[in-house]
Regions:
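Short, small-residue-biased leader/transition segments that mark boundaries at the very start
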Residues: 1-7
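Phosphate/pyrophosphate-binding loops at sites that engage ATP/ADP/AMP, CoA/4′-phosphopantetheine
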Residues: 8-15
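Acidic/hydrophobic-patterned starts of short beta strands in beta-sheet-rich repeat architectures
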Residues: 19-20
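N-terminal binding-site loop/beta-alpha segment at the start of enzyme catalytic domains
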Residues: 2, 15, 102-103
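Beta/alpha (TIM)-barrel catalytic core signal, keyed to glycine-rich beta->alpha loops juxtaposed to Asp/Glu
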Residues: 24-167
């Protein structure tokens, strides 16, 4: 326990972690989730969640947990909307975080006429329109980029709103 606390403090230069996720349902992930619950109860972790779990996997965690996952991180984008999973998560008050919100940079998604037309209308890039689509759909998005201009553009999403027809 002391080593774990020292690791958080020294290696991460913090006394706590904002969000800790189990990456996938592999190995003894039930025991791993219970350890995450313990860290949460000790105040070392502010929120816990899951990544790459199916609806059934999330239900398995819900059946045994004392601390409900806050978030499920999974691939979501306009070509893979995961509507049934999102409905289930909403009933459980679990948020969805869109992994690969731009569809792995799928060239076809970036050329999708509805997003291109909306981008022209709002003077936004196709990526910005897709990220706005996520926000309006209730998804948490954390797009990644090494390009400073793209990072800045990824934040410039709140001065327009897509209509129902554009979504």
């Amino acid at each position: 326990r002391r080593q774990r606390q020292m690791c958080i403090r020294d290696r991460l230069d913090t006394d706590y972690i904002d969000l800790l996720l189990i990456h996938q349902p592999a190995g003894n992930y039930i025991a791993g989730y219970r350890l995450m619950e313990k860290a949460y109860k000790e105040g070392k972790v502010k929120a816990i969640g899951l990544s790459n779990f199916t609806k059934e996997g999330v239900q398995e965690i819900l059946d045994i947990c004392k601390v409900k996952p806050t978030v499920l991180q999974t691939e979501v984008h306009p070509y893979d909307q995961k509507k049934e999973l999102k409905e289930f998560l909403a009933k459980e008050n679990i948020k969805i975080q869109a992994w690969y919100p731009l569809g792995h940079g799928d060239a076809e998604l970036m050329k999708e006429s509805a997003f291109v037309i909306a981008g022209t209308k709002y003077k936004k890039s196709t990526a910005q329109v897709i990220l706005r689509w996520h926000i309006q759909d209730g998804n948490i998005v954390i797009p990644g980029s090494k390009n400073a201009d793209h990072i800045k553009a990824n934040l410039d999403l709140f001065d327009f709103q897509l209509t129902e027809e554009e979504r």
